[in-house]
Amino acid sequence: MTTGLLQGKKGLITGIANNMSISWAIAQLAKKHGAELWFTYQSGVLEKRVKPLAKEIGCNFVSELDVTKPKSISNLFDDIKEKWGSFDFLLHGMAFADKNELKGRYVDTSLENFHNSLHISCYSLLELSRSAEALMHNGGSIVTLTYYGAEKVIPNYNVMGVAKAALEASIKYLANDMGENNIRVNAISAGPIKTLASSAIGDFSTMLKSHAATAPLKRNTTQEDVGGAAVYLFSELSKGVTGEIHYVDCGYNIMGSTKL
């Protein structure tokens, strides 16, 4: 086992859907660095996928979490308080948009989809952070996942880009609020990665090809790339870093254009 950047730390990992999830890659590396973990799953269907993954790396705590239901959130943190007392880091890894409205024009987004997308993808970070703050007795680190579509228009991203933009603004305000308790809040802006969530994005294979061709490192981002960045942000190595968008996209975001 890799020793210690997170030795003795406890962390809550949300957003695992299967073994291709970015949250799963982050969890694996956090465990290798000594962390004790608590997983969540969104529904009974995902429970069947998440529990075997938890068992695979010796994660003894797995709970249901539906961020659209306040009682589900309070039940989770009551359990954490009872079992752990306190904990050290939180990964906010969930996002949602109606895949049917990721096609076509953003202007045609329905009110229901806009509300659900912003609630699950952004407001849930506030709710989880508020609950986590009360249990991060010795300070802590909160990390969420974002994407370049928050800053620039990406085809077939639509309302999710707006939700990620709101998420990125939120981390700055949360970082300001929670800094007095030595809790850091940051986001990782990862390049496009093939996951269950990304399968809802139209023409995703073209996005991957374009990213690899444009990025200075001439490849696509991997789950492991993001996992390493997350471990850094969870650990004491980043104790002076908060309110930041940390790019893990092989340099794609620095490019103004491709070679002519």
UniProtKB/Swiss-Prot annotation:
Pathway: Lipid metabolism; fatty acid biosynthesis. It comes from the Bacteria. Keywords: Fatty acid biosynthesis, Fatty acid metabolism, Lipid biosynthesis, Lipid metabolism, NAD, Oxidoreductase. Substrate binds at A97. Coiled coil: none annotated. CDD domains: ENR_SDR (cd05372). The active site is at Y147 (proton acceptor), Y157 (proton acceptor). GO terms for biological process: fatty acid elongation. The keyword Lipid metabolism applies. GO terms for molecular function: enoyl-[acyl-carrier-protein] reductase (NADH) activity; identical protein binding. It catalyses: a 2,3-saturated acyl-[ACP] + NAD(+) = a (2E)-enoyl-[ACP] + NADH + H(+). InterPro entries: Enoyl-ACP_Rdtase_NADH, NAD(P)-bd_dom_sf, SDR_fam. Its EC number is 1.3.1.9. NAD(+) binds at G15, S21, I22, Q42, D66, V67, M94, K164, I193, K194, T195, L196, A197. Belongs to the short-chain dehydrogenases/reductases (SDR) family. FabI subfamily. Catalyzes the reduction of a carbon-carbon double bond in an enoyl moiety that is covalently linked to an acyl carrier protein (ACP). Involved in the elongation cycle of fatty acid which are used in the lipid metabolism. NCBIfam families: PRK06603.1 (NF005145). Homotetramer. This is Enoyl-[acyl-carrier-protein] reductase [NADH] FabI. The gene is fabI.
